[in-house]
Structure formats: structure tokens, C-alpha cells
């Protein structure tokens, strides 16, 4: 019986030696000298992590009588040439242009939904049908002009709809009523 116990211990010791050689021992951290050191040479104000130097040139959006419309709506109104470029972009992407208008609330407000952000439960009225098969940006711009004549006091936006993924991919204001045109710089 003693011989059987010894042989088991000998086998176990041999297995432990094999396992120990399979796992490398921890040698500590590598020295910092092996890593390359890169430092910025010029230390101008744009390389500082804080934006403290740029605070003086920033403007705050005035919350009184300044409504939030769509993405980038704080920019000046788009000219016809700029609208054509935006429309050409959505046509190049293969999206279907569609016009929508709103006669009462062209801005974000909370009527049916309480979550923050753009999705507030409001719906715009579609102008005619989506322009399936449209390949000319001037056709879309002509529809914007027609909508302006029919509803001069309405907000008009152009959306680009991807009919494969069935999602709205782009949306921007094409026209704001005269009473709401303002500049954030004329406070």
C-alpha cells in the first residue's frame, strides 16, 4: 500500500511541475523607458484642455422669444442656392424628398409627450405626396414656393426619407413665416 501512495504523490508532483512551467511568472511592470514619449511643442490656447480662454467669444442662446425649431435652425435662413445644395445632397443619397408644413407651432414644444429632446409628439401636415422618383432639386424647390404661396404663415420643412430602411434621414427648415424671422444677434 505504501508503494501505491508514493507513486500517486510522484505523479502529482510531476503534474504540478508541468503546470508551473505553462504559466509565466509575474515579473512586474515594464519600465517607463521602453515607452515612447511624445510631447506637444507649441502650447497655444487651443491645446489647453479647458475652454476658459474661449469663453469670451461664446454667445449664450437667449431663451426669451427665441424658439428652437430644427437641427441647425439657429443659423440664418438658407438661401435658394443653399436649399438646392441640401436637396441635391439628399437626392444623391437616394432619399425621397418630402415637404411638410405646420401652421401653428413650428417650434419644439411639449403637448403629448414629456421626454426631453426633439421627439415631442407633434406632427406636421404633409404637403402633397412624397416625391418618389424625383431626381431634380429644382422640382422640390418649386414645391416649396407653392407651399409658401398657399400657406404664407406656415413653417415649411424638407425631409429626406429612406424608403429601404424606412427612416427619416434628414430634416431642415426651408421657410419660416415673416413674423418669426429673427437673428440671435439682434437681442
Swiss-Prot record:
The gene is RBCS. The lineage of its organism: Eukaryota, Viridiplantae, Streptophyta, Embryophyta, Tracheophyta. GO terms for molecular function: ribulose-bisphosphate carboxylase activity. This is Ribulose bisphosphate carboxylase small subunit, chloroplastic. SUPFAM superfamilies: RuBisCO, small subunit (SSF55239). GO terms for cellular component: chloroplast. One of its GO terms (biological process) is reductive pentose-phosphate cycle. RuBisCO catalyzes two reactions: the carboxylation of D-ribulose 1,5-bisphosphate, the primary event in carbon dioxide fixation, as well as the oxidative fragmentation of the pentose substrate. Both reactions occur simultaneously and in competition at the same active site. Although the small subunit is not catalytic it is essential for maximal activity. Signal peptide: none annotated. Residues 1-56 form a transit peptide. Gene3D superfamilies: Ribulose bisphosphate carboxylase, small subunit. Pfam families: RbcS (PF12338), RuBisCO_small (PF00101). The basic functional RuBisCO is composed of a large chain homodimer in a 'head-to-tail' conformation. In form I RuBisCO this homodimer is arranged in a barrel-like tetramer with the small subunits forming a tetrameric 'cap' on each end of the 'barrel'. Belongs to the RuBisCO small chain family.
Amino acid at each position: 500500500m505504501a508503494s501505491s501512495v508514493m507513486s500517486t504523490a510522484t505523479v502529482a508532483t510531476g503534474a504540478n511541475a508541468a503546470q508551473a512551467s505553462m504559466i509565466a511568472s509575474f515579473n512586474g511592470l515594464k519600465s517607463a523607458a521602453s515607452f515612447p514619449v511624445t510631447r506637444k511643442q507649441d502650447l497655444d490656447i487651443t491645446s489647453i484642455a479647458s475652454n476658459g480662454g474661449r469663453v469670451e467669444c461664446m454667445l449664450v442662446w437667449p431663451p426669451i422669444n427665441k424658439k428652437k425649431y430644427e437641427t441647425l435652425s439657429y443659423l440664418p435662413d438658407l438661401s435658394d442656392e443653399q436649399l438646392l445644395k441640401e436637396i441635391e445632397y439628399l437626392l444623391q443619397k437616394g432619399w425621397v424628398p418630402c415637404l411638410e408644413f405646420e401652421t401653428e407651432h413650428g417650434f419644439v414644444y411639449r403637448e403629448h409627450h414629456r421626454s426631453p429632446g426633439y421627439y415631442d409628439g407633434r406632427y406636421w401636415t404633409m404637403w402633397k405626396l412624397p416625391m418618389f422618383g424625383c431626381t431634380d432639386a429644382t422640382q422640390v424647390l418649386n414645391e416649396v414656393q407653392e407651399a409658401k404661396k398657399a400657406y404664407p404663415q406656415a413653417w415649411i420643412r424638407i425631409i429626406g426619407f429612406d424608403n429601404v430602411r424606412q427612416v427619416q434621414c434628414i430634416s431642415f427648415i426651408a421657410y419660416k413665416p415673416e413674423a418669426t424671422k429673427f437673428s440671435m444677434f439682434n437681442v
